[in-house]
Amino acid sequence: MGTILDKIVDQKKKEVAALYETYTPVKEKRKTRSLVKALEQFTVIAEVKRASPSKGDINLHVDVRKQVKTYEECGAGAVSVLTDGQFFKGSFYDLQTAREESSIPLLCKDFIIDKIQIDRAYEAGADIILLIVAALTKEKLKELYSYVLEKGLEAIVEVHDEQELEIAIQLNPHVIGINNRNLKTFEVDLSQTEKLGKRLNEEKLLWISESGIHSKEDIIRVKRAGAKGVLVGEALMTSSSIHTFFEDCKVNI
């Protein structure tokens, strides 16, 4: 029986095949916004996340324009948009809507396995592409990372364990994302940030913490580990006061 990640990647293969049948990439170049620059100070990458395999529906009918505008007003350094439809109920339309509303860097959060998905994200307005080590062979990861650079975009290369981290370090990527969620089981363990963060601090690489960040205490914990930013979805999508969450992120260590 396959893992959740296996099921997602199988679905992505079908979507990629459909894209090759129905989508022609645009040739025009455009200006992009830099996450690396935003991470010069501690940054919240605030996510638009309608649903997930682990939580089910989170905020299914969110007004993307309103949510993104609130994030930017509260001081988000970047916005992440889930574009997966089958498991997270997002879309490239959500990404495009966020681009129309936002002037800060925009991350396409999806399970990218092929260049044509990067083309589609670029057209929808993405500045940053998520590349998940667990979903790719070493060769495919290298190929897609090179293509991200070719498009003038930045990448977050996502890892969960030591083995994936060593693969990511070889790329010397713009940003490494430590995902506290195991994509095979979808269980969350914030100590992954502390374990892997030590190695990244030694390498002097730029990195962020992803998943399982819900409170001021969590923010303090990942800041102490050396993270330059956090990617937060569920906590913001269910928050009664997004402003308060952002205020908590300003705590000094």
Curated annotation (Swiss-Prot):
Pathway: Amino-acid biosynthesis; L-tryptophan biosynthesis; L-tryptophan from chorismate: step 4/5
Catalytic activity: 1-(2-carboxyphenylamino)-1-deoxy-D-ribulose 5-phosphate + H(+) = (1S,2R)-1-C-(indol-3-yl)glycerol 3-phosphate + CO2 + H2O
Top-level EC class: lyase
Record flagged with keyword Translocase: no
CDD domains: IGPS
Annotated keywords: Amino-acid biosynthesis, Aromatic amino acid biosynthesis, Decarboxylase, Lyase, Tryptophan biosynthesis
GO molecular function: indole-3-glycerol-phosphate synthase activity; phosphoribosylanthranilate isomerase activity
InterPro entries: Aldolase_TIM (IPR013785), Indole-3-glycerol_P_synth (IPR045186), Indole-3-glycerol_P_synth_dom (IPR013798), Indole-3-GlycerolPSynthase_CS (IPR001468), RibuloseP-bd_barrel (IPR011060)
PROSITE patterns tied to this protein: IGPS (PS00614)
Domain of life per record: Bacteria
Membrane-spanning residues: none
Pfam families according to UniProt: IGPS (PF00218)
EC number assigned by the record: 4.1.1.48
UniProt keyword annotation of Cytoplasm present: no
One GO process term, biological-process aspect: L-tryptophan biosynthetic process
UniProt similarity note: Belongs to the TrpC family.
Record protein name field: Indole-3-glycerol phosphate synthase
Organism the protein comes from: Bacillus thuringiensis subsp. konkukian (strain 97-27)
